[in-house]
């Protein structure tokens, strides 16, 4: 009995175990399938970008809807910066995740959307990576300043890109490769509303057709960039806007800062009124962006995609309005130009959280790739910020050793490009512990050989004193008489096919052509097949020789006659010494002895263009010069100097011609009676024109042989110069200052309310020497900005004590700290990839606000500085 009960118990137990095991396996299989499905549903990504939106001047204070959605519903990054305060370079960094020195877009003009950018960096934007992994990518709005709409950038399935720079009306967009012009109708053409409608319609359509495909959209607004045209319903808001009046407002001049700050004085009353109106109009344009964010949020909520969508909101750089006396603009390394708004809202983001770590525009691309589940490419300089957004997960309550988040505390701010030659020279100076430049100049000027005004034999340099009392060293210019003597004394020798040493000049030889050879030459010249040697003047400027090779023999075009006033055909004789030249002329002085040179046959290319007496442009657009220029450094230097002098002379001539042309335009006579026959329509006039045409200058005749490609290039360059000239003329002479970037503002600039009716004025916003590289550091103990300018000027601001960068305190910083800052700056200037461009924070002493110091782990490699 016991045995039967025991057997029954075992049977029931085995049945229960089998049932439990099968249910467990089924549960595991189901859980794995669900996790796999969730893994396949990747989140949507929406990047909202504004143009020129600041943080320091209070632009976010009026955007209540955006702050409610993004700040209260997501994470706020209170230390968000851009690595360059320029539109096109910053946007290029956002797309590629690279510093400016790695994508080579330094300004809004140079290389912006150029063929080099299109071939090298555009195929490696985050859009390309996402598109290749199944994301439906779409772009709406402003792309790059110089984008011309002729192509669709790679990686974008839907493309609605603005052609050229920001506008709200009267613009052109490229819709999937087709250009579409818009006018001045608010209901149909207002740019902010247009791209909002386009993006919402695309999202709805895409989810309806491809419900399981994730979407990545960029909505790139033109606001609050100029011309600051607001929607009509917002044109009366904020009449007393004053958020832009910060402690640095109209704080000028600043003699302790770099050159443009020293040059800029306090604003005039008309400038101050302009800043007030400008701030008001900028805030009005942002109201349409605020409405756009609300519409986007509501659309996502209606479609049930809000909890599966990451929304990122930021700007390409900041802005200043009146700060340090600068009426408006960007491009400065100070916080008002490099701080930007930065918010992220998404599935793993805690609402209302604040992130104190530094985030940059170069972090956008790696972050977007990380959201999509992709690794960061090694050539990207930024890092994903998702690790800063991880929620605190419950773990072992007995575990006390939690890893702290290690993040950068320093980054590079750069603007402009240094010439390589100058950069290397400065690099050598900085690393040699030499005296400052002004002290070295002072020592040199104490030497007797530099104190005379280029009067000593062989003197190459002289010291002078400028108007401010500074000593300068200038190179002595050789007088024209010395140059003429030097040219005449240069001997003409055979380039030789000698077997001894082709680089050696062995002097004169006794070689002379035989009588038979000279007879063969004369017969060749009388031959009708030699008529291609048309009579013409080979040169009109002083030179030495020009070589012609015929039947294995080398002939020289004798150009010594160039100094004569009366031009005549030049003889070409076989190469020999001067005495044999004279004998040959006496013996073989027959008329047939001279061979007339034709410039087109000198180098064997009948359609080549003679640019100088030694260089030609061949039909295949390549340049070919005499071998001497490629073999002799002296000849190369002389010819380059000659070309530079010719360019300078032609530029002066062009300037004079433009002045005469302007004079003629101003003194244009009254219109004549066109029914009468003009002088040049008469027979005499026609003959005169034909006569002039048949006696063209040799250079002009050769210029007619330029191919159509070169002519098109010149025509485009001429038109570009004319456009620049018209802009300068529109500004006026008083607003076109050398070395400065200036603008004029008048009553016609703003075409929408509120209008400007106080007349025109001129203001300068930047300078050509405003090139710099800066370190910006933010951590628990330090908050500073250190800058090196291309002029050699240094700036240092401690934001703990001077949050508005009012005073440059570089003179109070210890030399050892400056050396370390310079070394760290040089490392970041050449970094490549996120491993080099995001160094671990250096160990800083826990100093007080009076200052701290770096660990002295580096040598003093740099000692030449100027503050």
From Swiss-Prot:
Modification after translation, per record = The conversion to 3-oxoalanine (also known as C-formylglycine, FGly), of a serine or cysteine residue in prokaryotes and of a cysteine residue in eukaryotes, is critical for catalytic activity.
Give the top-level enzyme category: hydrolase
Give the residue spans that cross the bilayer: none
Q: What is its EC number?
A: 3.1.6.-
Q: Which residues bind Ca(2+)?
A: 51-52, 87, 316-317
Biased-composition ranges, Basic and acidic residues, are 498-513
Q: Does the keyword Zinc apply?
A: no
**What's the protein called, per UniProt?**
Extracellular sulfatase Sulf-1
Q: What is the native source organism of this protein?
A: Coturnix coturnix
Q: What is the lineage of its organism?
A: Eukaryota, Metazoa, Chordata, Craniata, Vertebrata
UniProt gene name:
SULF1
